[in-house]
Amino acid sequence: MRRSTDPRNLLVRRGPLLVDGESAISELDPGFFPTGDAPKMSSTTRRRFNLIAFTPGPVTVISSLVYLALLIPLLLVHTIVPSAPKSNPKGVDLSEAWNDLQHLTSGFHPYNSHRNDEIHQWLLQRVGHILDASRKAHEDDAMGSVAPDVFVFDDQQSNLTFSGGGVGNKPITGVYFEGKNIIVYIRGLEDDKENWWDSPGGKPKGKGGVLVNAHYDSVSTGFGATDDGVGVVSVLQLIKFFTSPGNLPRKGLVLLLNNGEEDYLNGARAYSQHPLSKYTHTFLNLEGAGAGGRAALFRTTDIEVTRFYKSSPHPFGSVLAADGFKMGLIRSETDYAVFKGVLGLRGLDVAFIEPRARYHTDQDDVRHTSIDSVWHMLSAAIATTKGLVSYTGSEFDGRAPGKGMVNSGVGTHGVWFDLFGSSFAVFRLHTLFAISVTLLVVCPIVLFVIGIILSKMDKMYLFSIHETIPETKEKVSVRGLRGLFRYPIILVVSSGILIGLSYLLAKVNPFIVHSSSYAVWSMMLSSWIFMTWFLSCIADFFRPSALHRAYTFTWQLLVMWVLLVISTVYVNQHDIAAGYFIVFYFAGTFLATLISYLELFALPNKTRYAREQSQYPSRLGSNRSSRILSPSADELPTGGDNNGEIYDGEEEPTESSSLLGRQRRTTFANYTRTGRDLASSESGTYEDHSETGVFGEEQKWSASLPTWTWVLQFLFVGPVVIMFIGQLGLFLTSAMNQVGADGVGLLVVYIAIAVFSVLLLIPLSPFIHRFTYHVPTFLLLVFIATLIYNLAAFPFSAENRLKIFFVQELNLDTGRNQVSLTGVDPYVQDIIRAIPSASKENISCDSELDSGRRKCSWPGLAPEVVQDEPTDRWLSFNISKPSSQETKDTPVLHARLHVSGKNTRACRVNFERPIRDYSLPGSALDDRMPHTLPQGISEIRLWSRTWENVWTVDVQWDAEDMDELHGRVVCLWSDANQLGSIPALDELRLFAPPWVAISKLKDGLVEVSRGF
């Protein structure tokens, strides 16, 4: 029997069959092909070696390289601190700064410690030595420079009574504090030459100055290297820099070393009572909430001051952190809150942010920081301060932002972020809003117009099922609807798995992120990539579609449009700029989607294609799907003649023929492959680079689609997303991965990592079905390994310790001596069992406090914080007999308390029921910080600059509430420098497991109380 050569009876198959079939057709009708030209043999070779074609090899390699090329630098920037210069920059001595840091952190120095007094005197001496060296440098200067006027204030007078806390209707906490701040004022070249602060009621003239602040007190359980030792030595170096020849400031510079920040920002509040607080209009606050690493720009008041940080050699930070404070997601505070909220200054908060496990512990020391970290903060401080003191405009000399505040003007909300730690972007929030609104309106219109044009040109293959031939009314399938709902299903399934993994980790091993955040990231990323690839390949196997990219980008654009709407609303109504990355994400997605729509112009019009298909039907739909399932309605050409002889590229079968054809083998689900199919499969792909340019079993009209535009699409979306999402994801992980010890639920951390993993990898979705199996298979192995590790590994180590919180409480009324540890259950009980003195005691644990934290107590070793005194004499107080006073509303009772403690300068008075008012003779009051509120005062904290001070406290309460005053007087001891003063703490440090870090629970390490 002769082989049929009638093209109407040819079923075009894969491999050589397709070539033979199409060659026969092209000989009869070259116009059959959408391009109008029959393919040439050489085109296959060129396409096969096209390095940017939309084929598995280039897609896998290019996508992987782009991700690696951007993620690796992001990781390096995030984990490696830029090296300090080998030689000292002009006006700075890094060796001197490092030596100062070593001396400062040689012991614990909280406000309520004798070491704190020693540090105070040492700082005064250091300032004096720096100024002496500066004067000598000016005398030796060949240019004949004149040393600036510098004034050093050892503020031993400022005190203040104020209140804090009291959310809603809850009673507030009253505070009396006596400051011990050190203030250095360097007179600017353009400053008023009069010492206006010496005159009662004197006021500064001219432009406002610049304040740089750091606090020199530490917590009682931390050496304070980064909190805030690096800030302190940076201030000392700023004094050195701005008093050196050639560096004199044009505007006055105030450098504040405040004492008492760790105890509710008391030092900054005391500064508000000093005359110089009226002079400064801008500020730079140097802080630390970690141990080493890079100093991040944590938050700023406005764009005008933020621009001066831009000149930092290694800027680092994002507006996301600032918005975290605005939305109440970050609960800790710094002196920034006082300078901005009370004084009305405009400025910046620069702080170390990781690792939080070392924050307020004995690992906040010089061994866990570096000279590089010192230089990172110092260089940023020099650049920012230099810009502020050199600025002579009137930007910061406007109307006061509030009552009692300085005339610093009102700033503009801004957006800011760094790029790879080397450049810094800053622009107005209104600009972000304008761009967002423009994109929201213009982008849909552009796509709508293009869609109309494509429809007019009869090239809108998207959303098309079939095309009707006008002459015969015959309907021909174009299969343009294929893949429409593929992407949302895949996205939901793949992302849902990550959410499930988040819940799994939070349930089985919630603290693994504490020490192994990168393992969690690896698990999330590898899981999403493999599952998305697997589902995409299944969909492409059964229903291949050349419109997969177009539909995927369209769905992504729709989702990003909704997110951009939400972000724009927050920008407009709440001044929240944290969604700035969505603007760039949306813009890149729009450009990629636009390219997919523009590609359709290269296709033949649908009517012509339908005529050609009707005249020369080439196949019954997809070979893959049709061999497994019956052809669907959109795959069969209506009315076509499909009963002719089918040519499959093999000889007519005879009695001696093989049961299977030479080129055909049965595979999955009896799907018959040709020899070339099998070869492709064995090489890791199932592609078919036929002469027509159609990939695999995709729609025949797709031969006219360009094969290189995917690179543009990926470059529009991929790098932008990686840079922004990668940076923010790492930043958030560093800030959040170790908050579980503080009582914060870790599920939100895992979900945040899952969400950022999805956002980071979404750019791969339109292309991932073209990946070869090598990368996904490797990532499957990574996923399995990291999943097992994350579920089974112990979450703490000597480098990433679990923080527990210590306090010892002694009740003089009952003689009860109780040591308490607060931490995460069950670890806190495991730790207590390792303590010898607790091994035979009855351990009592309170009910769960927050997110698994419990307070467990036992009778502990007696404290020795006061030498040669019996315990019952460690604190003393007396209360005068209440006296009444009639008011318009209700009778008020008065009483006077005298409170004192041995070897301490911190006590407090707790009341069983809130009192109405209180006062201390000689204390300053400030309307900007009211000392009482209508809901009353439940506690008064007392701080003195002198040891064993006697506080006199007058209190008032409503007679109808109580006839007599009831409560407790508590005195605090926070000095743990001397071994043996707090034996229970010494024992805990000696016997606790190496994966445990000890921090303070309350203001005092030891608290002794007596009732009244």
Curated annotation (Swiss-Prot):
Glycans are attached at residues 159, 842, 878. This is Vacuolar membrane protease. InterPro entries: Fxna-like_M28_dom, M28_fam, Peptidase_M28, PFF1_C, PFF1_TM. One of its GO terms (biological process) is proteolysis. GO terms for cellular component: vacuolar membrane. It comes from Coccidioides posadasii (strain C735) (Valley fever fungus). Its cofactor is Zn(2+). May be involved in vacuolar sorting and osmoregulation. Binds 2 Zn(2+) ions per subunit. It is found in: Vacuole membrane. Residues 1-60, 454-487, 540-550, 597-710, 765-777 are cytoplasmic. GO terms for molecular function: metal ion binding; metalloexopeptidase activity. The record marks 359 as: Transition state stabilizer. Its EC number is 3.4.-.-. Zn(2+) 2 binds at residues 227, 262, 360. Zn(2+) 1 binds at residues 215, 227, 287. The keyword Mitochondrion does not apply. The active site is at residue 261. Keywords: Glycoprotein, Hydrolase, Membrane, Metal-binding, Metalloprotease, Protease, Transmembrane, Transmembrane helix, Vacuole, Zinc. It is a multi-pass membrane protein. Residues 82-432, 509-518, 572-575, 732-743, 799-1012 are vacuolar. Residues 614-629 have a biased composition (Polar residues). Belongs to the peptidase M28 family. It is an enzyme of class 3 (hydrolase). Residues 614-660 are annotated as: Disordered. The chain crosses the membrane at residues 61-81, 433-453, 488-508, 519-539, 551-571, 576-596, 711-731, 744-764, 778-798.
